[in-house]
Amino acid sequence: MNHFKKIAGVLEAHGLDAVLLTCEANRFYASGFHSSGTDGAAIVTRNRSYYFTDSRYTEAAARYVQGAEIRQTDREHPYSALINEVIEKEHITRMGYEDEYMTAADFHRFSEKLHCELVPATELLWTLRAVKDQAELDCMIQAQRIAEKALADILGKIRPGVTEKEIAALLLYKMLHYGAEDKSFDPIVVSGANGSLPHGVPSEKPIQAGEFVTMDFGCKFGGYCSDMTRTVAVGHVTEEMETVYNTVLKAQLAGIAAAKAGVTGAAVDGAARQVIADAGYGPYFGHSFGHSVGVEIHENPNATPSNSKPLPAGAVISAEPGIYLPGKLGVRIEDVIVITEQGCQNITLASKELLIL
């Protein structure tokens, strides 16, 4: 799976002869091939595509990159020289670059050495990546199923005395065991008072009876991410715990019900936020309702209070409201939804009923 043709198809409308891809995520989106960090570059022109890498990846690139000419860089043939060869061959005068990713040092170096005008093109790439095709969705759904199987396997291990770190390690192992290529991000496992830390780091803290345990995790399949959060209780719950949990779930369902192509990200966020505010917990929901997911765990567009743009059909967005009472507890519930013309499709199947282990 690659998107060379999809990228090439929008260049003329944006007044570009080509686009230069240097960041790992955009290189993978275009080519379907992983090379780590800065070890690669690609140029997509209106008619042809080129993939540049060094000797460590040349053989693999030749095997897996379809629809692009492979060029090998080395000490005698640096990236700038190879890129200039393509610029001359393809008569490129205006080339897009990733202004939100490229470092100032790299931009300065390319600006000095490349024989064409460099034009910001991150927004163009974000717009393309926002709308997933069926092959991309299939990978994301498979990643989600793997994560759900991992969760089902480890629920029986969550009990008093087990540490947050141990639960995080089990999730990672199980996702790899069931076929994940990698984790989407470092898993978040927080319990009790640590639950009020939305992005808390799993610690040596033992889980205790009467606490919530929040697990935010995901994996990659086919280069695409999954993302989900479930909060479970251990032993028993108080009335307050149950109220907070049910409020978060009601807010999530309200946001999902509001999600539809053409609706703004702010409107989706607002539907969920209003539920939490009406329950008296407004100050304790500080982050946004959701972010897009794809090749990267955080993409665009987002369901945030500041996003006044309509969501496109085909966008894949997390739905993850939360309530965090400092020093006391936290609850977050997260699914991933696909925006459609009719509403949205929830690709997360794991139960959201309050589970008391």
Residue spans for each PLM region:
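Active-site neighborhoods and metal-handling regions in enzymes and metal-associated proteins
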Residues: 1-357
